[in-house]
Design a protein with these regions (language model features):
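Helix-loop boundary and gating motifs at the non-cytosolic
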Residues: 6-73, 123
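C-terminal ends and interior cores of transmembrane alpha-helices
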Residues: 98-117
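Juxtamembrane intracellular "pre-TM" segments in multi-pass secondary transporters
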Residues: 4-17, 221-251
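Hydrophobic core of transmembrane alpha-helices in multi-pass small-molecule transporters
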Residues: 107, 118-136
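Cytoplasmic membrane-interface "Motif A"-like loop-to-helix N-cap segments
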Residues: 87-103
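C-terminal membrane-cytosol helix-exit motif in multi-pass small-molecule transporters
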Residues: 171-184, 206-226
Length: 251
């Protein structure tokens, strides 16, 4: 309706800043979990042996996590065009973005339980966190042309990048301090205390991601398409997703 068009005029500074602020919320995942802490924590699980049996196969620990990571990107390549086709059609990018933010955040928290006894559950949380992080970015980035004029897009992206850099470094420093001085945070003053602090750092990432993304969700417009039920029946939602998938693979 013209009413909604008037409210969501492109270039609203508050909306643009709220969009950029999502980088502050999510950048803690690739830095703290992806790069700094999780690889070290994962290594501590395999002090006795580098090999583990999964589904009857003997895996080297590094190969195992690489296989799971590859599977995530394989699925993303197939599912993301499908999901963004559906989101474009229904006009509910925000719902998709929220879904992956919540799924990703809770999966980060779930990494607290990642150990050799719970290896399947741990790998599932690792998988879901990585998948959700990248999937949320797809919907996040597709918002930009809807809310920013072409001339503003570079600046808003750069603002997001700087928010993300500062936010993730703050949380990383806090977690590194906790891991290196576990006794100051109520953990044992030992290697075991540091390992426990690493697990708690996964909880902090999940909490940070979910907490700070609320500001973004509050200000981002829903951009609902006014899709009548008749139109929905005429145009299959799934077909819209598949068309997009095919066009992406043709490139």
């Amino acid at each position: 309706s013209s009413m909604t068009k008037r409210i969501f005029k492109k270039g609203n500074i508050k909306v643009l800043k709220a969009w950029a602020f999502y980088d502050w919320a999510n950048s803690v995942y690739p830095l703290v979990i992806g790069t700094a802490v999780f690889p070290i924590y994962y290594g501590t699980l395999f002090v006795d042996s580098d090999y583990i049996e999964i589904l009857g196969f003997n895996y080297k620990n590094t190969a195992l996590i690489q296989h799971v990571t590859s599977l995530v990107f394989l699925l993303l390549a197939f599912l993301v065009p499908l999901m963004s086709g559906i989101a474009d059609f229904l006009g509910n990018k925000k719902s998709f973005m929220k879904l992956f933010v919540y799924l990703g955040s809770f999966s980060c928290m779930g990494l607290y339980f990642f150990d050799l006894e719970n290896i399947y559950l741990g790998l599932l949380f690792y998988f879901l966190a990585l998948f959700s992080f990248w999937a949320s970015l797809v919907f996040y980035n597709s918002y930009l042309p809807d809310i920013a004029n072409p001339t503003e897009q570079d600046n808003v992206s750069a603002l997001g990048f700087s928010y993300g850099y500062v936010g993730s470094v703050i949380l990383l420093l806090f977690n590194l301090f906790m891991i290196n001085f576990p006794a100051s945070f109520g953990f044992e003053d030992s290697n075991q205390g540091s390992v426990e602090a690493m697990k708690v750092s996964f909880l902090t990432v999940g909490f940070w991601w979910i907490f700070f993304s609320q500001y973004t969700f509050h200000h981002l417009p829903s951009l609902k398409n006014n899709v009548s039920e008749k139109e929905l029946l005429k145009k299959s939602i799934l077909f819209s997703g598949f068309k997009k998938l095919i066009s992406v693979w043709r490139l």
